[in-house]
């Protein structure tokens, strides 16, 4: 008998605990207040609502006597939360009206439902016995519960039979009737062009109450003193099940457009002259600028608005956690209720009188208050923990957004610095006129600086990678420790269960001697309870096995990542070697051309300088001979008479001397011609060097422009990814799903990757800022960074590949240094050659002066007399000539040796230059991949952030649930020793039990106005699991979530898959008078065309400026429709052709045509075509522009553009 009492106590305590939990999660609101709520006040503080409901549930209605106090139990509180929230208004027609009972809290109490009163016929011979008043009250408390649920479902019958949309429309009609008559009930407004629409989108939580039915099997209960077999019966009971659902609600708010201020949105004084350029109404950029200008004019404080938004998001997360808890509580309540029904059947067979006093003791309010206090404390602790957790999460998110904003500002500064660097072109033109060797030295210095900067940049990422590895190891150890703690907690739970089982067995052994039938019933109940415990233990074991399997999966992923890193290392090394070989080949080809030029120069010098030296030596010898002869002839000049006589006799010798002088003059003239040719060739060589330098500078400037474009596009992609994360962060609907996600552990790694790339961009900004100060260095780096946009997106390089690349770069720089040294030697040789040329010129000038001085007296002497020579003078002249020829031979040998050294130096220089070119080409090809590898990490930031939030919420939820279960177990163990005591015996009067008629009904509480998106997710398995199978029918749009999907149906269809059509009486058109309409996501794109197009086909707009929704594909030039709705498109096309034509295409069908033709086809003219279109398009359709005839020129900034955006969804 004591075991029976214990089980009855246990079932009642569990039923009351979970009934109180369900009561706390109910959501009620007066009907009068629902009509006056604005969209901004729909998401009220859930903690305040829950506290009010708990307060109303715990009031003491003992002011009307014992009878009223007995009737106003916790079931009445549950009836208040589920019935229509209108206590003072008159019930509508068609609903069952119930009288009000006067209690202390004015609670609506419904009478018992006695429609079906089956009686149990006792066996013959049994006397008629009346039940006591206490027993009658006890049975009425159980029958009143089901009767109240029946009446509540009847009162909500009309709304249950109608759809969620109909209920919402009737509420909106009631609120619409209360508006003043001067308001206009339409979406149109009389506002002017100075007003702009601002869209606000948020998640609105809604509590859904459902009822579940249970049909127990087994024998029915018999009379109190019946004997023999009893008739078989079935009893159907219902219990409340609460669920939470999030609704996406978008509201429209009118504010002043950018440039307008004041309550009437008047134009500013400083912007009166710019009126023609400020007509954009609902542009995303204008809205962002308008927010900054309208912060002072808005009625609300921006800080308060931000604070309220954070509070709303916190409350939404709390509701999602409470939903899971309510579902679990409802399931446990079902099990305990089944146990209670089985006990109720057994009570009829017990003829003792101790049971009534035992039940009366159970209804004491001290236990009820104790349970309520414990639950309040647990919920308070849980609420504090959740507030702290969410505060930390939002703090982390805000810091991440600040870092991303600082990165964006830094990139903008880089762009500004690039614009300022264009002002240094005059300085660059002045440097082009300097000699080539200065440019080479500057290039050497720039390469040294680049090598130092690359070394500095490489050290920090390596250290960061080491820190990341240590962090990952610590996280793995922490996870192992958590698993160990989970095992310990599981063992403790099992030990507690074993102790409880031992206590139950002891109680059963003590009470086993009283009644055999009672022992069998208790054994069956105990076995059921033990089976339930075994099932829970098996579930926990399965969860543990799943955790272990997830751990193995993570370890396999880590091993796969290491293998991928090694493979990427090898592939990168092979690519680097190939690129270096290619660059070496190119540089060898260039040095070969340089060698040919130097060979031509050497040949020219050999052809000019060597003959010139020979001729100069001959002339010097002849001059020496002449001077010697003049000295000999000097005494003869004094004897003019005798010399004249001899000259007359020797005319032949004079003619020979004249011929020699003429030959000497011709040789001198030829020497002058050769000298002029040498100077001309020297000038040509210098001009060629200057032209090559100019071409080099031109190429560097072109590479600088292309590098700027690549950096701008890269930052555009990063900004789009950041905006995508920020826009979609609030739109997550499945934060309440507590399923285990094996990708949670990857969150830290992804976040670290994002942070490391932020630091790398900061280093990049610093290096670019230093490059701006040095023009040659800046141009060289821009030439290297040009290849950033040439690498395909599927190639990825990780941080470990940078070390190999830097080693190859260091080797290349060492080779370049050797090349520069050789070039410096070559420059010194060139200087020496120029010096010798100058010396030759001075010597030629001196010889010419000497010849002129010598010829003047020589011509005079020929006029006066002849020349006498003898054999001695001839011998002396021959000796002098021999010595001079020997000296010339020595000079020629010295020159040949110097030219051979010069050729050797030139060859070494060519080899070094080729090596340097191969190294630079390899770096040009490899550097762009470093930045390309960072794009997938930034695109996966959205998943990482959401998974981080879900992991933290799961941990906090598990901690709160474990604390709650521990307190309940402690309460049960404390009360176990105090309640099992002998009770007084009371007479039992016989009264037939009444069958409780239940009606399965679903009551939906709608919190806000919604258009065609109010869908109910039932626990029934759905046929479709994602949008890939196209589940939405009748033109509905499928919106994907994390674990399910939602169909946005078109009017007048509704349902999970848009298959239910609303009746004509209920199909009321949607009303947009209050500015609320269905969720409209941001979908917009703007692209331009900077390349030329000469062939017909789709126009591929290459420059992507805006792409919200990621629906435009630059590779195909097509815009894919993401949602069913009305879209607006605009296009502008420029052409120099005489005839241009094309089409606006939708899914391969030409919808619109644009054409322009000149009457005179031979005249070349510039024309611009513009057009716009508005279409209602469905999901999956594609839109593009197709050129049929004509060409599109290359122009930057571009003129040819194409844009579009989503106006509203249908």
UniProtKB/Swiss-Prot annotation:
Residues 1078-1210 form the C1q domain. Residues 57-102, 143-190, 276-299 are annotated as: Disordered. Glycans are attached at residues 133, 161, 201, 250, 328, 415, 491, 525, 560, 602, 712, 765, 810, 822, 903, 915, 963, 1000, 1037. Disulfide bonds join 196-257, 222-230, 256-265, 1027-1038, 1032-1047, 1049-1058. It comes from the Eukaryota. One of its GO terms (cellular component) is collagen-containing extracellular matrix. Extensively N-glycosylated. Residues 1-19 form the signal peptide. InterPro entries: C1q_dom, Collagen/C1q_domain, EGF-like_Ca-bd_dom, EGF-like_dom, EMI_domain, Tumour_necrosis_fac-like_dom. Its main location: secreted. Residues 143-155, 177-189 have a biased composition (Polar residues). It is found in: Secreted. Residues 80-92 have a biased composition (Low complexity). Residues 163-176 have a biased composition (Basic and acidic residues). Keywords: Coiled coil, Disulfide bond, EGF-like domain, Glycoprotein, Secreted, Signal. Residues 192-267 form the EMI domain. One of its GO terms (molecular function) is calcium ion binding. One of its GO terms (biological process) is positive regulation of platelet aggregation. Carrier protein for platelet (but not plasma) factor V/Va. Plays a role in the storage and stabilization of factor V in platelets. Upon release following platelet activation, may limit platelet and plasma factor Va-dependent thrombin generation. Ligand for integrin alpha-IIb/beta-3 and integrin alpha-V/beta-3 on activated platelets, and may function as an extracellular matrix or adhesive protein. Multimeric. Composed of varying sized, disulfide-linked multimers, the smallest of which is a homotrimer. Proteolysis of the promultimerin in the N-terminal region, leads to the mature p155 form that is stored in platelets. Interacts with factor V/Va. This is Multimerin-1. It comes from Mus musculus. The gene is Mmrn1.
């Amino acid at each position: 008998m004591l075991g029976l009492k214990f089980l009855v106590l246990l079932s009642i305590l569990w039923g009351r605990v979970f009934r109180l939990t369900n009561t706390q999660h109910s959501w009620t609101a007066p009907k009068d207040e629902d009509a006056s709520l604005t969209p901004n006040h729909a998401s009220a503080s859930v903690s305040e609502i829950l506290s009010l409901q708990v307060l109303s549930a715990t009031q003491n209605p003992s002011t009307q006597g014992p009878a009223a106090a007995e009737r106003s139990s916790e079931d009445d509180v549950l009836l208040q939360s589920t019935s229509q929230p209108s206590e003072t208004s008159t019930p509508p027609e068609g609903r069952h009206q119930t009288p009000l009972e006067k209690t202390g809290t004015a609670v609506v109490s419904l009478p018992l439902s006695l429609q079906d009163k089956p009686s149990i016929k006792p066996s013959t011979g049994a006397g008629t016995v009346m039940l006591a008043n206490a027993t009658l009250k006890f049975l009425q408390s159980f029958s009143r519960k089901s009767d109240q649920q029946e009446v509540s479902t009847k009162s909500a019958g009309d709304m249950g039979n109608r759809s969620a949309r109909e209920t919402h429309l009737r509420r909106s009609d009631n609120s619409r009737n209360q508006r003043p008559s001067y308001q206009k009930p339409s979406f149109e407004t009389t506002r002017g062009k100075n007003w702009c629409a601002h869209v606000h989108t948020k998640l609105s939580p809604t509590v859904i109450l459902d009822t579940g039915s249970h049909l127990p099997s087994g024998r029915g209960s018999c009379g109190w003193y019946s004997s023999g077999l009893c008739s078989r019966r079935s009893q159907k009971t219902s219990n409340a099940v609460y669920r939470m659902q999030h609704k996406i609600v978008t509201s429209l708010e009118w504010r002043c457009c950018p440039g307008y201020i004041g309550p009437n949105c008047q134009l500013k004084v400083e912007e009166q002259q710019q009126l023609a350029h400020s007509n954009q109404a609902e542009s995303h950029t204008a809205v962002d600028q308008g927010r900054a200008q309208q912060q002072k004019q808005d009625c609300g404080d921006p800080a308060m608005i931000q604070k309220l938004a954070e509070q709303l998001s916190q409350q939404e997360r709390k509701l999602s956690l409470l939903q899971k808890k309510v579902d679990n509580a409802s399931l446990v309540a079902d099990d305990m209720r089944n146990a209670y029904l089985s006990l109720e059947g057994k009570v009829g067979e017990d003829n003792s009188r101790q049971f009534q006093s035992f039940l009366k003791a159970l209804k004491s309010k001290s236990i009820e208050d104790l349970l309520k206090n414990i639950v309040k404390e647990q919920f308070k602790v849980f609420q504090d923990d959740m507030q702290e957790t969410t505060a930390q999460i939002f703090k982390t998110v805000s810091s991440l957004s600040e870092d991303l904003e600082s990165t964006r500002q830094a990139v903008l500064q880089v762009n500004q610095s690039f614009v300022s660097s264009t002002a240094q072109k005059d300085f660059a033109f002045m440097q082009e006129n300097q000699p080539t060797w200065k440019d080479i030295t500057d290039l050497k210095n720039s390469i040294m600086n680049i090598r130092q900067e690359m070394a500095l940049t490489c050290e920090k990422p390596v250290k960061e990678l080491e820190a990341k590895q240590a962090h990952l190891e610590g996280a793995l150890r922490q996870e192992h420790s958590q698993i160990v703690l989970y095992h310990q907690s599981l063992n403790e739970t099992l030990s507690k269960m074993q102790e409880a089982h031992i206590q139950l067995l002891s109680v059963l052994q003590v009470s086993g001697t009283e009644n055999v039938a009672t022992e069998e019933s208790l054994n069956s109940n105990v076995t059921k309870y033990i089976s339930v415990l075994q099932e829970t233990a098996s579930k926990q074991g399965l969860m543990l096995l799943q955790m272990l399997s997830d751990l193995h999966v993570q370890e396999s992923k880590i091993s796969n990542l290491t293998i991928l890193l090694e493979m990427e290392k090898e592939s990168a090394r092979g690519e680097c070697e190939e690129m270096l070989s290619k660059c070496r080949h190119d540089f060898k080809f260039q040095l070969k051309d340089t060698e040919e030029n130097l060979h031509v120069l050497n040949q020219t010098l050999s052809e000019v300088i060597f003959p010139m030296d020979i001729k100069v030596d001959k002339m010097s010898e002849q001059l020496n001979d002449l001077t010697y002869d003049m000295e000999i002839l000097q005494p003869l000049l004094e004897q003019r008479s005798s010399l004249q006589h001899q000259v007359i006799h020797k005319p032949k010798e004079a003619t020979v001397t004249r011929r020699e002088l003429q030959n000497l003059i011709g040789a001198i003239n030829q020497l002058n011609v050769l000298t002029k040719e040498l100077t001309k060739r020297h000038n040509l060589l210098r001009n060629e060097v200057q032209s090559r330098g100019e071409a080099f500078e031109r190429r560097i400037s072109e590479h600088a422009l292309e590098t700027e474009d690549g950096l701008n596009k890269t930052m555009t992609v990063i900004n789009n990814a950041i905006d995508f994360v920020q826009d979609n962060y609030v739109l997550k609907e499945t934060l309440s799903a507590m399923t285990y996600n094996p990708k949670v552990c990857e969150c830290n790694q992804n976040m670290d990757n994002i942070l490391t790339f932020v630091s790398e961009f900061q280093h990049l900004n610093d290096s670019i800022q230093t490059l701006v100060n040095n023009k040659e260095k800046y141009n060289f780096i821009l030439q290297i960074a040009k290849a950033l946009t040439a690498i395909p997106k599927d190639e990825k390089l990780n941080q470990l590949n940078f070390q190999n690349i830097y080693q190859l770069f260091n080797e290349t720089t060492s080779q370049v240094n050797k090349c520069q040294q050789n070039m410096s030697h070559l420059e010194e040789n060139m200087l020496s050659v120029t010096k010798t040329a100058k010396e030759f010129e001075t010597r030629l000038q001196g010889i010419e002066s000497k010849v002129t001085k010598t010829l003047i007296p020589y011509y005079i002497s020929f006029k006066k007399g002849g020349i006498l020579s003898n054999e001695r003078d001839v011998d002396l002249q021959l000796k002098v000539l021999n010595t001079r020829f020997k000296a010339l031979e020595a000079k020629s040998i010295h020159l040949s040796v110097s030219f051979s050294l010069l050729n050797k130096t030139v060859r070494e220089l060519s080899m070094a230059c080729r090596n340097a070119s191969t190294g630079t080409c390899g770096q040009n090809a490899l550097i762009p991949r470093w930045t390309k590898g960072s794009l997938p990490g930034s695109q996966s930031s959205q998943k990482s952030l959401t998974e981080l939030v879900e992991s933290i919420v799961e941990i906090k939820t598990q901690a709160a649930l474990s604390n709650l279960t521990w307190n309940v177990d402690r309460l049960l163990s404390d009360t176990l020793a105090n309640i099992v005591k002998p009770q007084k015996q009371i007479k039992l009067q016989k009264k037939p039990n009444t069958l409780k008629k239940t009606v399965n009904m679903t009551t939906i509480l709608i919190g806000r106005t919604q258009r065609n998106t109010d869908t109910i997710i039932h626990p029934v398995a759905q046929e479709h699991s994602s949008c890939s199978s196209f589940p939405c029918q009748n033109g509905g749009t499928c919106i994907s979530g994390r674990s399910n999907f939602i169909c946005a149906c078109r009017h007048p269809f509704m349902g999970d898959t848009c298959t239910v059509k609303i009746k004509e009486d209920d199909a009321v058109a949607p009303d947009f008078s209050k500015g609320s309409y269905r969720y409209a996501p941001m979908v917009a794109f703007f692209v331009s065309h900077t390349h030329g197009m000469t062939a017909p086909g789709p126009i591929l707009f290459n420059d992507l400026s805006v792409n919200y929704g990621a629906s435009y594909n630059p590779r195909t030039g097509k815009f894919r429709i993401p949602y069913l709705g009305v879209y607006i498109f605009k296009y502008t096309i420029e052409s120099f052709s005489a005839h241009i034509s094309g089409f606006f295409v939708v899914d391969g069908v030409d919808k619109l045509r644009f054409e322009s033709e000149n009457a005179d086809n031979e005249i070349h003219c510039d024309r611009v075509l513009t057009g716009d279109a508005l279409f209602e398009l469905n999901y999956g359709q594609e839109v593009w522009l197709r050129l049929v005839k004509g060409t599109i020129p290359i122009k930057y900034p571009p003129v040819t553009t194409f844009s579009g955006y989503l106006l509203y969804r249908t």
